[in-house]
């Protein structure tokens, strides 16, 4: 776990390497070639991908994408794919609140790992539209952080940590239907769940098997067909 400023609390599995390489996608249209970075191309399909630890920068980018899609006025779902070890709680709560704010339904899918704050975002999707891929892992635990300074400063930060812990448990309780005391007991230490266990716990609504993966591909294929029609107009 990396050291953080005394006023910052986080929950996660530590730093992960981040690559600056972003693939480009080139499309042929009736108006010629169009080149997109891969994330812009996904955004065009109303897909937001969170694939790193959640910090202020990632949270700001995610919030901006959600607000952009909301500004389009479409009632089509926004699909958030999560592969994240967690991160800074304040940053994650900003993303969570934006997910609840936008009017378009938010679907969430765990692809690989949704740990700590990542599990909160996963659970925060629209009821019936939260999923895990079959080999995904989900992990819940209590917030972590540290501080230093005078005794009064430490007391203030301890109270803030307690508030964050309570608020996160309230959010998980709301989305899972579990009692807060049960959430607190389970999250006292790293609590790992398989995709099926996450579904049973109420963090997600389904595990994507071959059948509903085909259905998902069909939805995206129909979306691409609509885009092609609009390009020809």
UniProtKB/Swiss-Prot annotation:
Top-level class of the enzyme under EC nomenclature: hydrolase
Record EC number: 3.4.21.92
Molecular function GO terms recorded: ATP-dependent peptidase activity; ATPase binding; serine-type endopeptidase activity
Pfam families associated with the record: CLP_protease
Catalytic activity: Hydrolysis of proteins to small peptides in the presence of ATP and magnesium. alpha-casein is the usual test substrate. In the absence of ATP, only oligopeptides shorter than five residues are hydrolyzed (such as succinyl-Leu-Tyr-|-NHMec, and Leu-Tyr-Leu-|-Tyr-Trp, in which cleavage of the -Tyr-|-Leu- and -Tyr-|-Trp bonds also occurs)
Subcellular localization, as worded in the UniProt entry: Cytoplasm
Alphabetical UniProt keywords: Cytoplasm, Hydrolase, Protease, Serine protease
Any one annotated GO CC term: endopeptidase Clp complex
Keyword Cytoplasm: yes
InterPro entries with a match to the protein in the record: ClpP (IPR001907), ClpP/crotonase-like_dom_sf (IPR029045), ClpP/TepA (IPR023562), ClpP_His_AS (IPR033135), ClpP_Ser_AS (IPR018215)
Active site: 116, 141
Entry keyword Cytoplasm: yes
GO BP, sorted A to Z: protein quality control for misfolded or incompletely synthesized proteins
CDD domains per the UniProt record, alphabetical: S14_ClpP_2 (cd07017)
Function of the molecule: Cleaves peptides in various proteins in a process that requires ATP hydrolysis. Has a chymotrypsin-like activity. Plays a major role in the degradation of misfolded proteins.
Protein family according to the UniProt entry: Belongs to the peptidase S14 family.
Assembly behavior: Fourteen ClpP subunits assemble into 2 heptameric rings which stack back to back to give a disk-like structure with a central cavity, resembling the structure of eukaryotic proteasomes.
Protein name: ATP-dependent Clp protease proteolytic subunit 1
Organism (species): Salinibacter ruber (strain DSM 13855 / M31)
């Amino acid at each position: 776990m990396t050291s953080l400023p005394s006023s910052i609390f986080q929950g996660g599995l530590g730093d992960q390497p981040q690559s600056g390489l972003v693939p480009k996608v080139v499309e042929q249209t009736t108006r010629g070639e169009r080149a997109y970075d891969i994330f812009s191309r996904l955004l065009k399909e109303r897909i937001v991908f969170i694939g790193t630890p959640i910090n202020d920068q990632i949270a700001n980018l995610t919030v901006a994408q959600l607000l952009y899609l909301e500004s389009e006025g479409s009632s089509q779902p926004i699909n958030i794919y999560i592969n994240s070890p967690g991160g800074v709680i304040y940053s994650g709560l900003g993303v969570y609140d934006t997910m609840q704010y936008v009017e378009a339904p938010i679907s969430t899918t765990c692809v690989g790992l949704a740990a700590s704050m990542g599990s909160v975002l996963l659970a925060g999707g629209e009821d019936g539209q939260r999923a895990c891929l079959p080999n995904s892992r989900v992990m819940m635990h209590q917030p972590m952080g540290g501080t230093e300074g005078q005794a009064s400063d430490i007391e203030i930060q301890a109270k803030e940590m307690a508030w964050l812990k309570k608020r996160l448990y309230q959010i998980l309780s709301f989305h899972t239907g579990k009692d807060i005391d049960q959430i607190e007991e389970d999250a006292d230490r790293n609590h790992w769940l398989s995709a099926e266990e996450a579904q049973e716990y109420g963090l997600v609504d389904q595990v994507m098997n071959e059948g509903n993966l085909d259905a998902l591909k069909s939805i995206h294929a129909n979306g691409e067909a609509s885009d092609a029609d609009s390009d020809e107009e």
